[in-house]
């Protein structure tokens, strides 16, 4: 009987250690408040990109990219915020003066964010563009996915590298 009494504290300690390890592992899987805020900020960032493109707001469009960002699509790579802004200003120029200039609406789905660390993340989402003349009809104009590297600069998430894959 004394042997059982001596082993009981060791057994309790072992059980407590296993329980604590399980709790810590479970807690590690739960997102922190900071991570949840970062996910929301990234979601807003990618939506802001589509709003800027659909409304042809060149400054808003450029603002979602880091100063030295790279953006690759259609066989071209644009380097730096000014070159990326020019994508939209060129589009504005092409549409200027058109009586029934085309409109576009981007829809994003299946957004996935993976944090590399607290200042870098990977983002992937699928997109579809509905487009057509202002008077209609609208059709699927394109579809593909975005693959992004995001960086946190001055507390703000920005696109460092974006590749459009169709």
Regions found by a protein language model. Give the residues of each.
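Aromatic-acidic/polar surface patches that form glycan- and anion
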Residues: 38, 42, 54, 77, ...
